[in-house]
């Protein structure tokens, strides 16, 4: 996909290549070479900005990033889809943009206006936070109550009952 088209689709929200801090655009051979030994988690939420329907902009880009890293022989890349839907506003948000962040950082109760703060949400937050913490420690995303997470092309679906596809 041409980079200017990608930039337009993402509303200009791409990393700015400055040649120093960000030396190359993600998924270019140069960027992949720099980070080839670093395991990565990449994923999206189910609805992003489209309540009631599956995301069609961010998800394909995340899958492509995982595919590119895998094809380049990089360290493992772990793909996820966050499908848990917020009950807030009678469920109108679904699994909206950035909803996984309170779960990854185990801040579900702190952000109950976004998450609803229910028991299932709190438990999922505990599990997801352990997954990310273990990944930071070992390079392997794992936690009790979460299926063994295999690298791409597998996909971890986080929900009340998480599953590996």
Residues covered by each model-derived region:
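Active-site-adjacent substrate-binding region
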Residues: 13
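C-terminal helix-and-tail extensions that cap enzymatic domains
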Residues: 1-10, 27-165
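A Trp-anchored, charged/polar loop motif used as the substrate-binding/catalytic surface
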Residues: 16-31
């Amino acid at each position: 996909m041409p980079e200017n088209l990608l930039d337009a689709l993402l509303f200009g929200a791409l990393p700015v290549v400055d040649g120093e801090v960000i030396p190359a655009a993600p998924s270019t051979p140069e960027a992949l070479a720099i980070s080839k030994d670093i395991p990565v988690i990449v994923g999206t939420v189910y609805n992003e900005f489209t309540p009631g329907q599956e995301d069609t902009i961010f998800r394909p880009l995340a899958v492509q990033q995982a595919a590119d890293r895998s094809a380049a022989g990089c360290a493992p890349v772990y793909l996820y889809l966050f499908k848990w839907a917020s009950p807030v506003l009678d469920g109108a948000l679904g699994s909206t943009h950035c909803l996984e962040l309170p779960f990854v950082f185990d801040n579900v109760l702190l952000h109950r206006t976004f998450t609803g703060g229910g028991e299932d949400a709190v438990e999922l937050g505990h599990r997801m936070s352990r997954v990310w913490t273990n990944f930071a420690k070992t390079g392997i995303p794992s936690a009790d109550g979460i299926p063994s997470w295999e690298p791409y092309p597998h996909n971890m679906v986080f929900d009340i009952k998480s599953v590996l596809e």
